[in-house]
Amino acid sequence: MPRPDRRRALLLDLFDRSFRGPAWHGTPLWGALRGVRVAEALWRPGRGRHCIWELVLHAAYWKCMVRRRLLRDPAVTFPRPGSDWPRLPERTDAAAWKRDLALLEREHLLLRRAIVRLAPAALDRRAGRWTVLQNAYGIATHDLYHTGQIQLLRRLYR
């Protein structure tokens, strides 16, 4: 009987905890977004600073790009215009906010599915500058980094 790949199990654990929790460090990304309404999602602490909504789109974009790297599939594209920091929708209402939250969740689930389907040997394969494993750990820590920003923005907004 083949041994389960411990690295992939640990990676999925980190990936899941950074997005949904529970995590010893506190709130995961999805938890930090709980209860955010449109006005709060659009609020900026200053000119040229990102708002929560932009952080959500940025996180979704990079989940998509990491999936593209892992799958080596140039057909994997983000469904919104712009790269790195996709533009906000033209209408920034509650329905659009809900759609973009769903986009973040969908990109997370698609990336998770891609990680689950990877052969253990694929973890050491290059996916751009970094290995598959480094890309996947990187996106989990990317979530945590932006979770901290979102929590800070929420405190400043109040």
Predicted feature locations:
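Short, contiguous alpha-helical
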Residues: 2-33, 38-87, 124-158
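Acidic/histidine-rich alpha-helical segments that form the ligand environment
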Residues: 86-124, 134-139
